[in-house]
Amino acid sequence: MTGYIPTLEQIDELHRKIAPSEAAYELVHTHCVIVATIGCQIVRRQNALFTRRCTLSKDAPERGSNRRTENTVDAAVSATPMPPTVGVTGGQVPPRLLDEHLVLIGGLLHDIGTYRVFKHDGSDGEPLKFSKKRYILHGLKGYEYLLDEGVDESIAQFARNHTGVGLTCEDV
């Protein structure tokens, strides 16, 4: 690790530092909060499945059997699924517990580069508008910004990789 893992307060400071206007901050930061919230709900569900993996019935749909025969499809339909976790249903048992805090930080920072691809950034009172041509660059712009600010690569990669940039065929 060569950089720092930002706290929630530092994440807000990173957003405010790069935001060209209050309107831009409100749009991008609110979106990031929504994504982080949904991500954390999914992780809680996955971790609940992992924690309860020993008590799930063998035919529970959350076990995610890769073999699909007529009998297993019938069994999966008739099996009792695990009750919802924080309003989330479905999913499959992950191979290990997932890091909810990492998902929270990644979700809050994943779109931080969008501040650098506005065509109209709201600073002059005009409505916000993204540059369609440059929008694909927002992941790389966010990655570079976070690294320049001293954020660790393990966190900065959330900005870079959520658009697919930086992923190899093997990663996918």
Predicted regions and their residues:
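Divalent metal-dependent catalytic cores for phosphoryl transfer on phosphate-bearing substrates
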Residues: R96-V172
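Amphipathic alpha-helical segments within well-ordered protein domains
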Residues: H15-R16, C40, R44, L140-L147
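Alpha-helical phosphate/pyrophosphate-handling elements in metalloenzyme active cores
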Residues: A24-I105, D148-V151, A156
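Short amphipathic alpha-helical interaction patches enriched in hydrophobic/aromatic residues
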Residues: I18-E22, V43, T163
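Active-site flanking loop/helix segments enriched in acidic
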Residues: T7-H31, F50-C54, R67, V117-F130
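Acidic, low-complexity proline/glycine-rich segments
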Residues: M1-T7
